[in-house]
């Protein structure tokens, strides 16, 4: 099996270079593998599937075109786009996964997550996450007028950016105990996640067993991704955005 893993693109009109990189990526590296896994924060924010902007439509069309070539598409929601639903998924021809999701990758267990569930030192954020991930809360929120939803989201984004300036850097990273607990609960797999914007390859020894953890990079003026072919180990690569190479 061959697959690419990406996260934290934060697509929006204000980031045209990232948009160009993403569309080029879908026409390039993504067509050379069997599966593409998008592990959250594909969009800068998502107010609901009824907010069909030209950008959103262009992204869904590009993903659907990739699916037409035979690449299977999977999306695991992030903290910015957890309201993305089945309507968009149908248009984009992708499957939405729960967080976390354990997959069988050539007879090896691989655990996928956006990664924010591991940042347990940030107790304020975890309380907020539990609230907004509750299905009842989401249903009530999506029943509000679109303009009101977008206003609320803009306010939350401002609060989030302000709070980041006041938080210690370490509480916004993953908690080692949370990582080890998750690995133990899922049979000591390889873990792939994003969210922290701290790309790295870690090895955790849990109950005497070595478990790899790959942290995906966020996108700026290039397009970082993790490629994994069944015959070898994962490889972190970058697809040049500005040059399209």
Swiss-Prot record:
Mn(2+) 2 binds at residues 41, 79, 114, 195. SUPFAM superfamilies: Metallo-dependent phosphatases. Its EC number is 3.6.1.54. It is a peripheral membrane protein. Keywords: Cell inner membrane, Cell membrane, Hydrolase, Lipid A biosynthesis, Lipid biosynthesis, Lipid metabolism, Manganese, Membrane, Metal-binding. It is found in: Cell inner membrane. This is UDP-2,3-diacylglucosamine hydrolase. It holds the Pfam family Metallophos. It comes from Aromatoleum aromaticum (strain DSM 19018 / LMG 30748 / EbN1).
